Amino acid sequence: MENQLAKSTEERTFQYQDSLPSLPVPSLEESLKKYLESVKPFANQEEYKKTEEIVQKFQSGIGEKLHQKLLERAKGKRNWLEEWWLNVAYLDVRIPSQLNVNFAGPAAHFEHYWPPKEGTQLERGSITLWHNLNYWQLLRKEKVPVHKVGNTPLDMNQFRMLFSTCKVPGITRDSIMNYFRTESEGRSPNHIVVLCRGRAFVFDVIHEGCLVTPPELLRQLTYIHKKCHSEPDGPGIAALTSEERTRWAKAREYLIGLDPENLALLEKIQSSLLVYSMEDSSPHVTPEDYSEIIAAILIGDPTVRWGDKSYNLISFSNGVFGCNCDHAPFDAMIMVNISYYVDEKIFQNEGRWKGSEKVRDIPLPEELIFIVDEKVLNDINQAKAQYLREASDLQIAAYAFTSFGKKLTKNKMLHPDTFIQLALQLAYYRLHGHPGCCYETAMTRHFYHGRTETMRSCTVEAVRWCQSMQDPSVNLRERQQKMLQAFAKHNKMMKDCSAGKGFDRHLLGLLLIAKEEGLPVPELFTDPLFSKSGGGGNFVLSTSLVGYLRVQGVVVPMVHNGYGFFYHIRDDRFVVACSAWKSCPETDAEKLVQLTFCAFHDMIQLMNSTHL
């Protein structure tokens, strides 16, 4: 990253935005062909035949008309999906988003210079905060390197949403407020908000034209910490952000109606660079076991994180850190980038601040004191109760598999991401006795404002291989051949999805055109196989590769009887974070992770046994 930053004077972060290609609309015939292929693992012959007829009827009838209208829409937009996706996937969703939509993850500093240690929260916090603020300055100066695949630049628009961004609840649809500006565009907010024990404080991070230093940040954080630990807790307004969206919107309107000053305070939080959260707990963490820390970050104290904020930087009493982010403005890879940057800086400086200890005479933090009444306090208590009830139902299993990693799989000519995806398919098959429809995130940032496409990893080839692994009459050579066929299929599909040739977003576009035109929902979308194969947000496995760095993440399952499964890949290990709902008797995150680890061994054994 440092080398990249050195080169970055030649290129500006956002300089290629105008030259990126528009998001293409795939061919209707190709999309429907791929869709039919994806439902096969979940259908018997009769069901498949019925779906095939529905698809043929759709293709020659209403589907073609909708497709033509979609092509018309695409002519006038560089990204025909962007606004739709934001609304349908995020802003129209009414369930509580802090737990159900946000993503979270631990900072990797505990693996090197910052193992858990009581009494380090404030000093370490000042250092990690300073490195985050440096990244903010690089972004304002457009010195964050442009992401590329080979020499092809990727869309960088999501980086605009990292700082000074917040979702605002609406009665039927939320909105996103983004206050960030690059230096060439003008002024940008330069304050952060700190939440501690139900209270909120604000201070500027620029003093007399210069960024505050870690010793100065330490003074500010110490002031807040002492004040909150020697005085009564605050009302915990932040807990309202964990509520069901329409209820939060109404509670917010009431809060603003109570006193106009409350709106000014809310806007201070919305426009802040980030929210820095001070937790009192000390979650256990080791480089092999992430379960407790990940749970603490994802489902910690609702009064000290602002669920709608694009970036909550969370600190714990034992000096470990993490982030909790609203998913609407950006995808996890943006957070991975800043997390890796900060971790590298902490590593390079051996976890210490090596600069001046001088503290300038900077103004003390100012407390944001909301005007509240009985109704607001009651709303807060109701939000907390709802959040804690749902959060207590979540099971998290997050561990490192350390027998081998990317180095060995590459050596065996196996793509490491596909390796994990197929191991997960086998684990699910062994645990549940049938295939699991699976969503893997594919990246479409080759295109203007591109975000993601759905890659359906539960292929016919993957299922045939899983069946062969459970059938004692199938020999090793045949099992290996079936596995390699599953690898080839997966790799091709991932390539297609990243090139704008996936089908899930295309089908969504056709459905939304029908809705906008006031037409009945086409039979393709009401066919039981559509949802049984994962369509309409019904994937039992919701998965994503977090990358190849020391950064891990987690999300909750997409459906009640499903799993969230995030993982990252290193030379010597695979780290997996799996979530499930305890109230679902069918699912068990611990078992699924352990069976996935067993599958890793089985797959490598398969390659070893056949001397390839």
UniProtKB/Swiss-Prot annotation:
* One cellular component term from this protein's GO annotations in UniProt: intracellular membrane-bounded organelle
Q: In which pathway does it act?
A: Lipid metabolism; fatty acid beta-oxidation
Q: Tell me, what does this protein do in biology? A: Beta-oxidation of fatty acids. The highest activity concerns the C6 to C10 chain length substrate. Converts the end product of pristanic acid beta oxidation, 4,8-dimethylnonanoyl-CoA, to its corresponding carnitine ester.
Q: Where does CoA bind?
A: 406, 410-417
- Where does this one sit in the cell? Peroxisome
Catalytic activity field: octanoyl-CoA + (R)-carnitine = O-octanoyl-(R)-carnitine + CoA; 4,8-dimethylnonanoyl-CoA + (R)-carnitine = O-4,8-dimethylnonanoyl-(R)-carnitine + CoA
> Quick one: which gene encodes this?
CROT
In the record, the note on similarity to other proteins reads: Belongs to the carnitine/choline acetyltransferase family.
What is the name of the protein in this document? Peroxisomal carnitine O-octanoyltransferase
Instruction: List the source organism.
Output: Homo sapiens (Human)
In this UniProt entry, the residues modified to N-acetylmethionine are 1
Query: Which key words are in the record?
Result: Acetylation, Acyltransferase, Fatty acid metabolism, Lipid metabolism, Peroxisome, Transferase, Transport
